[in-house]
UniProtKB/Swiss-Prot annotation:
It is an enzyme of class 6 (ligase). GO terms for molecular function: ATP binding; phosphoribosylaminoimidazolesuccinocarboxamide synthase activity. Transmembrane segments: none annotated. This is Phosphoribosylaminoimidazole-succinocarboxamide synthase. It catalyses: 5-amino-1-(5-phospho-D-ribosyl)imidazole-4-carboxylate + L-aspartate + ATP = (2S)-2-[5-amino-1-(5-phospho-beta-D-ribosyl)imidazole-4-carboxamido]succinate + ADP + phosphate + 2 H(+). The gene is purC. Pathway: Purine metabolism; IMP biosynthesis via de novo pathway; 5-amino-1-(5-phospho-D-ribosyl)imidazole-4-carboxamide from 5-amino-1-(5-phospho-D-ribosyl)imidazole-4-carboxylate: step 1/2. PANTHER family: PHOSPHORIBOSYLAMINOIMIDAZOLE-SUCCINOCARBOXAMIDE SYNTHASE. It comes from the Bacteria. The keyword Lipoprotein does not apply. Belongs to the SAICAR synthetase family.
Amino acid sequence: MKALTKTDFNFPGQKSVYHGKVRDVYNINGEQLVMVATDRISAFDVVLPEGIPYKGQMLNQIAAKFLDATTDICPNWKLATPDPMVTVGVLCEGFPVEMIVRGYLCGSAWRAYKNGVREICGVKLPEGMKENQKFPEPIVTPTTKAEMGLHDEDISKEEILAQGLATPEEYAILEKYTLALFKRGTEIAAERGLILVDTKYEFGKHNGTIYLMDEIHTPDSSRYFYAEGYQERFEKGEAQKQLSKEFVREWLMENGFQGKEGQKVPEMTPAIVESISERYIELFENITGEKFVKEDTSNIAERIEKNVMAFLAK
């Protein structure tokens, strides 16, 4: 099992490359983007030292499936998936915010709530809520899109408009799409015995039209609970059974790492790496309802290059 942690392609018409935390994005002729989902894994805004075999393939295939399942809600950037780890799409001018939508009080929102915070991103939260409780209606809590190495910051709708990050008309569309996509994601999850707890969407503009970009409803961008036993666990105040990369965050915290200054990432043994890979495969199969088919990992970069070149030559 090999993992792809860095790419250095030179595709025809390539103008630039951006290396994100997990994805490497190649700009082709200022018209298309070749997005490679690597096997890098990040937690607490830090890229961990070891890659996770098959993770990129899983994320790319889940995102492609959900992009295809939501084209009636809003246009999206995807044109093709020439390789299991690659999506090629329309180059959009991205909004510098991530649209986060939460159906339940958990994660960072719960940590803030527990400490007395009753307003997140300008959204007032009801009193007396418990961890993992469902909100009366899903709430939208955007964040800024941080540069590599910096943390994303919460931002309110008012601040987004005041800073000119989106016009009122644009923001209304972003919010409408966000809630409609979350509703669809929730319905698809329910068919699989899952609860879509929270997720994030990114949008951009192309020729004046707002497009959904990047990945959607993947375990990297979303948190899922198992529906079975949710209510009992909630009533007893027990931790929910999660389908997300929370298990990676928990392992890091148990080993004294929370992404804070001066903390060192714990050593990731082959056994830890393999167990994370297996958990991701479980996520894939639960979320999609399909068996995960492992691609040959003997020479991933060569395979990707060949497949993308063939697509671009069309």
